[in-house]
Amino acid sequence: MKTTLLKTLTPELHLVQHNDIPVPSLKTCGWNTKNFPCKGHSLSVGXPQNAKQDVLWLSEVEPFKNGNAIRGGVPICYPWFGGVKQPAHGTARIRLWQLSHYYISVHKVRLEFELFSDLNIIEAKVSMVFTDKCHLTFTHYGEESAQAALHTYFNIGDINQVEVQGLPETCFNSLNQQQENVPSPRHISENVDCIYSAENMQNQILDKSFNRTIALHHHNASQFVLWNPWHKKTSGMSETGYQKMLCLETARIHHLLEFGESLSVEISLKG
């Protein structure tokens, strides 16, 4: 991958080019945050400085090419979810966002990115706040109601040693288009693409291989989406990539976002 330094914004924050994509890169405030591609919008890799492993996952074969959704981090599915229109999961995850504001101190970092229409009208904003936790907030500014999902890819040690806690015992299985009863806590042993009702705004990913728990606190979500492609061939991923990742998405699918409404998730690490 070709990487070029474009601009130094502060001693801690740099704008670099990874192949086709401009990427703000940050290291400070208790978090090592390697990439914020201005496309998607996706925080690619990050972890508290005292963490032994990254919290977020990025595909080792990610090409950082225009027109392709980034396979990893937190791409934004917006203004629609799924394949109801093309491209699947909306246009926001394949468009360039603008870094509009940044604040950096010893104990806190705040970055804001905005998405504009062809007429230079703001459509959406993403803010990322890093303290000892990571707080991601998406705000919808479009005139029409919209769906949205924070498609978070979590880095795990071994998919066979993961337990997802706090999910309901029923879900909509997108693979067979049926409502199903499922166990909770949930273990992953096959291709999973399930939409859950957001009955409990807190989930935990128990990662036994890395001996840690990733805690999620969702705000203003109506659904969660649990996804792992297993052996299914997936663009932007290696054949074994599924073994090291799990997506648990904070979503507004059936209850649409109205102008000015936000959707957010707080991510923290235990262990």
Curated annotation (Swiss-Prot):
Annotated source species: Haemophilus influenzae (strain ATCC 51907 / DSM 11121 / KW20 / Rd)
Keywords (A to Z) from UniProt: Isomerase
Single Gene Ontology MF annotation: carbohydrate binding
Enzymatic class: isomerase
Entries under PANTHER family matching the protein: APOSPORY-ASSOCIATED PROTEIN C-RELATED, GLUCOSE-6-PHOSPHATE 1-EPIMERASE
Biological-process GO terms, alphabetical: carbohydrate metabolic process
Entry EC no(s): 5.1.3.15
Pfam family, one: Aldose_epim
Protein name, per record: Putative glucose-6-phosphate 1-epimerase
